[in-house]
Amino acid sequence: LKRWNTRLNGYLLELATTRFEQALFKSNRVVRLGDIVKLEDSKRVPLNSRDRDARKGPYPYYGATSIMDYVDDYLFDGIRVLLGEDGSVIDESGRPILQYVWGKYWVNNHAHILAAASDYSLEAIYIALQRTPISHIVTGAVQRKISQRNLNKLKLEMPDAKSLEYLQDIFAAYRCNCEENRGLVSLRDALLPKLMSGEIDVSKIDVAQLNSHLAEYSTVLGKLFPLSTLKGTVM
Protein backbone atom coordinates (compact mmCIF):
# COMPACT_ATOMS: atom_id res chain seq x y z
CA LEU A 1 0.00 0.00 0.00
CA LYS A 2 2.80 2.43 0.88
CA ARG A 3 4.54 1.65 -2.40
CA TRP A 4 1.30 2.21 -4.32
CA ASN A 5 0.72 5.58 -2.61
CA THR A 6 4.26 6.67 -3.44
CA ARG A 7 3.85 5.62 -7.06
CA LEU A 8 0.49 7.36 -7.28
CA ASN A 9 1.98 10.58 -5.89
CA GLY A 10 4.60 10.47 -8.62
CA TYR A 11 1.83 10.27 -11.22
CA LEU A 12 -0.06 13.11 -9.54
CA LEU A 13 2.96 15.42 -9.70
CA GLU A 14 3.56 14.48 -13.33
CA LEU A 15 -0.07 15.26 -14.12
CA ALA A 16 0.16 18.62 -12.32
CA THR A 17 3.30 19.54 -14.24
CA THR A 18 1.89 18.52 -17.62
CA ARG A 19 -1.28 20.55 -17.12
CA PHE A 20 0.83 23.50 -15.95
CA GLU A 21 2.80 23.30 -19.21
CA GLN A 22 -0.44 23.17 -21.18
CA ALA A 23 -1.73 26.28 -19.39
CA LEU A 24 1.55 28.06 -20.16
CA PHE A 25 1.12 27.30 -23.84
CA LYS A 26 -2.25 29.09 -23.83
CA SER A 27 -1.21 32.10 -21.76
CA ASN A 28 1.98 33.04 -19.93
CA ARG A 29 3.79 35.94 -18.37
CA VAL A 30 7.07 36.44 -16.54
CA VAL A 31 6.86 37.41 -12.87
CA ARG A 32 9.39 38.03 -10.11
CA LEU A 33 9.18 35.47 -7.33
CA GLY A 34 9.31 38.25 -4.75
CA ASP A 35 6.09 39.69 -6.18
CA ILE A 36 4.06 36.52 -5.63
CA VAL A 37 5.46 35.08 -2.38
CA LYS A 38 6.40 36.29 1.08
CA LEU A 39 9.61 34.99 2.64
CA GLU A 40 9.16 34.00 6.29
CA ASP A 41 12.85 33.42 6.98
CA SER A 42 12.79 35.74 10.01
CA LYS A 43 10.65 33.16 11.85
CA ARG A 44 13.25 30.38 11.55
CA VAL A 45 15.04 29.11 14.64
CA PRO A 46 17.94 26.63 14.38
CA LEU A 47 18.36 23.90 17.00
CA ASN A 48 21.63 22.00 17.35
CA SER A 49 21.64 18.23 17.83
CA ARG A 50 21.92 18.53 21.62
CA ASP A 51 18.90 20.83 21.76
CA ARG A 52 16.91 18.47 19.56
CA ASP A 53 17.85 15.46 21.67
CA ALA A 54 16.45 17.27 24.70
CA ARG A 55 13.26 18.22 22.88
CA LYS A 56 12.06 15.05 21.21
CA GLY A 57 8.45 15.23 20.09
CA PRO A 58 5.97 14.73 17.23
CA TYR A 59 6.71 17.78 15.06
CA PRO A 60 8.98 17.52 11.98
CA TYR A 61 12.18 19.57 12.09
CA TYR A 62 13.11 20.49 8.50
CA GLY A 63 16.54 21.30 7.12
CA ALA A 64 17.60 22.38 3.64
CA THR A 65 16.61 19.11 1.94
CA SER A 66 14.54 16.94 4.27
CA ILE A 67 13.22 16.21 7.75
CA MET A 68 16.22 16.05 10.08
CA ASP A 69 14.48 15.27 13.36
CA TYR A 70 11.27 15.53 15.37
CA VAL A 71 10.84 18.05 18.21
CA ASP A 72 8.33 18.99 20.90
CA ASP A 73 7.08 22.27 19.43
CA TYR A 74 6.42 23.96 16.10
CA LEU A 75 7.01 27.35 14.49
CA PHE A 76 4.76 27.04 11.44
CA ASP A 77 1.27 25.75 10.80
CA GLY A 78 -0.07 25.25 7.28
CA ILE A 79 1.25 24.83 3.77
CA ARG A 80 4.63 26.29 2.81
CA VAL A 81 7.27 25.66 0.17
CA LEU A 82 10.84 25.28 1.47
CA LEU A 83 13.77 26.06 -0.83
CA GLY A 84 17.34 25.16 0.17
CA GLU A 85 19.34 28.26 1.13
CA ASP A 86 22.86 26.88 1.49
CA GLY A 87 24.73 23.66 0.93
CA SER A 88 22.56 21.45 -1.29
CA VAL A 89 20.57 24.12 -3.11
CA ILE A 90 20.26 22.74 -6.68
CA ASP A 91 20.05 19.33 -8.31
CA GLU A 92 22.11 18.02 -11.24
CA SER A 93 19.92 19.90 -13.72
CA GLY A 94 20.35 23.21 -11.89
CA ARG A 95 16.82 23.25 -10.49
CA PRO A 96 16.09 24.14 -6.85
CA ILE A 97 15.88 21.69 -3.96
CA LEU A 98 12.27 22.05 -2.84
CA GLN A 99 10.06 20.69 -0.09
CA TYR A 100 6.27 21.00 -0.11
CA VAL A 101 5.23 20.90 3.56
CA TRP A 102 2.02 21.19 5.60
CA GLY A 103 0.69 20.69 9.12
CA LYS A 104 2.70 21.81 12.14
CA TYR A 105 6.50 21.84 11.90
CA TRP A 106 9.80 23.55 12.71
CA VAL A 107 12.27 24.86 10.10
CA ASN A 108 15.96 25.62 10.66
CA ASN A 109 17.98 28.41 9.05
CA HIS A 110 19.14 26.40 6.02
CA ALA A 111 15.89 26.63 4.04
CA HIS A 112 14.03 29.65 2.71
CA ILE A 113 10.35 29.59 3.70
CA LEU A 114 7.89 30.66 1.01
CA ALA A 115 4.32 31.67 1.85
CA ALA A 116 1.64 32.64 -0.67
CA ALA A 117 1.19 36.38 -1.23
CA SER A 118 -0.78 36.68 -4.48
CA ASP A 119 -3.45 35.01 -6.60
CA TYR A 120 -1.00 32.18 -7.26
CA SER A 121 -1.24 29.25 -4.86
CA LEU A 122 1.85 27.72 -3.31
CA GLU A 123 1.10 24.61 -5.32
CA ALA A 124 1.41 26.62 -8.54
CA ILE A 125 4.62 28.24 -7.33
CA TYR A 126 6.02 24.84 -6.35
CA ILE A 127 5.40 23.45 -9.86
CA ALA A 128 6.83 26.60 -11.47
CA LEU A 129 10.00 26.42 -9.37
CA GLN A 130 10.43 22.71 -10.10
CA ARG A 131 10.76 23.44 -13.81
CA THR A 132 12.99 26.53 -13.52
CA PRO A 133 16.83 26.36 -13.65
CA ILE A 134 18.25 28.67 -10.98
CA SER A 135 22.04 28.17 -11.20
CA HIS A 136 22.43 31.85 -12.14
CA ILE A 137 21.26 33.00 -8.69
CA VAL A 138 23.53 30.63 -6.74
CA THR A 139 26.68 32.15 -5.23
CA GLY A 140 29.70 30.68 -3.44
CA ALA A 141 32.39 28.38 -4.83
CA VAL A 142 32.90 26.27 -1.70
CA GLN A 143 29.54 26.69 0.05
CA ARG A 144 26.70 27.24 -2.38
CA LYS A 145 24.12 29.78 -1.27
CA ILE A 146 20.94 31.43 -2.48
CA SER A 147 20.44 34.85 -0.91
CA GLN A 148 17.03 36.36 -0.20
CA ARG A 149 17.82 39.19 -2.59
CA ASN A 150 18.64 36.86 -5.48
CA LEU A 151 15.67 34.63 -4.73
CA ASN A 152 13.23 37.54 -4.76
CA LYS A 153 14.59 38.63 -8.16
CA LEU A 154 14.17 35.16 -9.70
CA LYS A 155 11.93 35.27 -12.78
CA LEU A 156 9.29 32.60 -13.33
CA GLU A 157 7.04 31.80 -16.26
CA MET A 158 3.48 31.63 -14.96
CA PRO A 159 0.14 30.99 -16.69
CA ASP A 160 -3.09 32.71 -15.70
CA ALA A 161 -3.79 31.96 -12.03
CA LYS A 162 -7.39 30.92 -12.70
CA SER A 163 -6.20 28.18 -15.05
CA LEU A 164 -4.40 26.48 -12.16
CA GLU A 165 -7.32 25.85 -9.81
CA TYR A 166 -7.12 22.12 -10.61
CA LEU A 167 -3.91 21.97 -8.56
CA GLN A 168 -5.86 22.13 -5.30
CA ASP A 169 -7.51 18.75 -5.87
CA ILE A 170 -4.29 17.12 -7.06
CA PHE A 171 -2.28 18.29 -4.07
CA ALA A 172 -5.09 17.42 -1.64
CA ALA A 173 -4.83 13.83 -2.91
CA TYR A 174 -1.03 14.06 -2.67
CA ARG A 175 -1.17 15.15 0.98
CA CYS A 176 -3.72 12.45 1.80
CA ASN A 177 -1.45 9.75 0.37
CA CYS A 178 1.55 11.08 2.28
CA GLU A 179 -0.40 11.11 5.54
CA GLU A 180 -1.54 7.55 4.93
CA ASN A 181 2.07 6.50 4.32
CA ARG A 182 3.14 8.13 7.57
CA GLY A 183 0.40 6.24 9.37
CA LEU A 184 1.56 2.98 7.80
CA VAL A 185 5.15 3.63 8.89
CA SER A 186 3.99 4.35 12.46
CA LEU A 187 1.90 1.19 12.45
CA ARG A 188 4.85 -0.85 11.17
CA ASP A 189 7.16 0.57 13.83
CA ALA A 190 4.62 -0.22 16.54
CA LEU A 191 3.80 -3.75 15.35
CA LEU A 192 7.19 -5.03 14.19
CA PRO A 193 8.72 -5.44 17.68
CA LYS A 194 5.61 -7.32 18.81
CA LEU A 195 5.72 -9.57 15.75
CA MET A 196 9.42 -10.30 16.29
CA SER A 197 8.90 -11.09 19.97
CA GLY A 198 5.92 -13.34 19.29
CA GLU A 199 3.57 -11.10 21.25
CA ILE A 200 1.33 -11.04 18.16
CA ASP A 201 0.47 -14.48 16.76
CA VAL A 202 0.55 -14.18 12.94
CA SER A 203 -0.96 -17.65 12.55
CA LYS A 204 -4.32 -16.14 13.51
CA ILE A 205 -4.28 -13.54 10.72
CA ASP A 206 -6.78 -14.21 7.91
CA VAL A 207 -4.47 -13.69 4.91
CA ALA A 208 -7.24 -14.26 2.36
CA GLN A 209 -9.37 -11.55 3.93
CA LEU A 210 -6.39 -9.17 4.07
CA ASN A 211 -5.62 -9.73 0.39
CA SER A 212 -9.27 -9.13 -0.46
CA HIS A 213 -9.22 -5.76 1.32
CA LEU A 214 -6.01 -4.71 -0.45
CA ALA A 215 -7.39 -5.73 -3.85
CA GLU A 216 -10.57 -3.74 -3.22
CA TYR A 217 -8.52 -0.68 -2.20
CA SER A 218 -6.39 -0.98 -5.35
CA THR A 219 -9.51 -1.19 -7.53
CA VAL A 220 -10.99 1.96 -5.98
CA LEU A 221 -7.77 3.91 -6.52
CA GLY A 222 -7.56 2.65 -10.08
CA LYS A 223 -11.01 4.08 -10.80
CA LEU A 224 -10.13 7.42 -9.23
CA PHE A 225 -6.79 7.76 -11.04
CA PRO A 226 -6.67 5.55 -14.16
CA LEU A 227 -3.03 4.96 -15.05
CA SER A 228 -3.88 5.33 -18.75
CA THR A 229 -4.54 9.03 -18.15
CA LEU A 230 -1.24 9.49 -16.35
CA LYS A 231 1.26 7.45 -18.33
CA GLY A 232 3.34 9.37 -20.81
CA THR A 233 3.24 12.65 -18.88
CA VAL A 234 6.51 14.48 -18.36
CA MET A 235 7.72 15.72 -14.99
Which residue ranges define each predicted feature?
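Charged, low-complexity surface segments at secondary-structure and domain boundaries
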Residues: T17-Q22, Y70, H110-I113
